[in-house]
Amino acid sequence: MTFFKKIFNSLRFWQILSLILLLMIVSSVALYIYSRPSDDTFVIEDDFGGNLFPSAIVSTASTGTQVYIPSSRNYIGNAQSELAFRIRAPYNLCKIHVEVSSTPFFQRSVSDFVLPKKDVEYMVFPDILWNYEALKNNAQSVPVSVSISVSIGREDPVQKVKTYSVRSINECLIGYKDAQMNFYDTGIYFAAYVNEEHPMIDQLLREALNTRIVRRFVGLQNGESQVDKQIYALWFMLQKRNFTYSSVSNSILSSNVVFSQRVRTLDDALESSQINCVDGSVLFASLMRAINIEPVLIRIPGHMFVGYYSDKKKENLNFLETTMLGDVNLDDFFPEENLDSLSEGKSQTEMSRLTYNKAKEYATKKYKEFEDQIKGKGPNTLFLPISKETRAKIQSIGR
């Protein structure tokens, strides 16, 4: 009897031990499943609909200016990188390690962050080692696959991939909408296309001096009449280069959350001898800045022209319609004056002076028409002095 009792107890012991071992195995598997990184650890997401804007990245690279305001208040990192992902902190002071694989536009980039509060979702902008030359030379939008790997603490990394559209350097980001459809104006990026240090500027100024309208460029030193002569010398020089007017080139970007405007760089404008209202305004602004006359880019719905201060106190603001540089029909601007018929028999110099005066008159009329909207920062308007303060925020893209 005692023998059988021992056998029974022995079997019971092994059953209990097996049950314990089984529970331990199940618990370990469950712990592994629930503790390992999951596919929803983070989500690659951005506010620009999967678009990257080289002009915005390049123009703020050395200034650190934050023009773009992320839609999430809880963001970490440099938002101007435009690349981002969302992640919820599993615990307080959560450390994460981020690696972004290399692409033609940036090198492999590594960064570390601390997520302060548990259960709070953060928008994280990794550090990016940009290839600025590749960005500046990107002439058309191209797709690029961006691979981001995130490790939480000592856990294994989770990798996600998203395809972005790297826009042309000629696309200027002018605004975007957040999730609540609030619009954020980023028109300051137009300043990136004003390039007073372009290598061709000296040659253009020499051509303007060769017109003998002025002997030298002195900026604001000799009064307003001399300022007007200097501006006209630039005007006459550009007209002699036979620029032609081309209609406004809207971006091919199709989006209801991000908006851009195509702008020719100074290189492009000089090479093609074609300008629209935006191209002409940034071209003239580049030349004005080069001779120490402060220009102002003025945008109204569907149009842009350039202004400039003719005095040191910035009390006298003048305006110029740059599209009249090209071979245009003056009757389109002043239909009641029949100017085209009056132009017959006039020399190039006489026609240049006529169009210059009319370009000032037309732009002044347009400014007064939209003055209240411009000063009130109404929709699709912009008043952007290309001043030292603006240059401290936005640098030229260098083309």
Protein language model features and the residues they cover:
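N-terminal Lys/Arg-rich, disordered targeting/topogenic segments
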Residues: 1-12
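Alpha-helical and coiled-coil interaction segments, frequently adjacent to or embedded
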Residues: 83-89, 93-108, 161-165, 181, ...
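Hydrophobic/aromatic-rich core segments of domains that either
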Residues: 278-366, 370
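Secondary-structure boundary elements
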Residues: 189-272, 314
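Hydrophobic membrane-insertion alpha-helices, especially the h-region
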Residues: 15-31
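Beta-strand-enriched, solvent-exposed domains that form extended recognition/catalytic surfaces
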Residues: 36-175
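Extracytoplasmic/secretory-pathway proteins
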Residues: 170-201, 221-228, 327-330, 336, ...
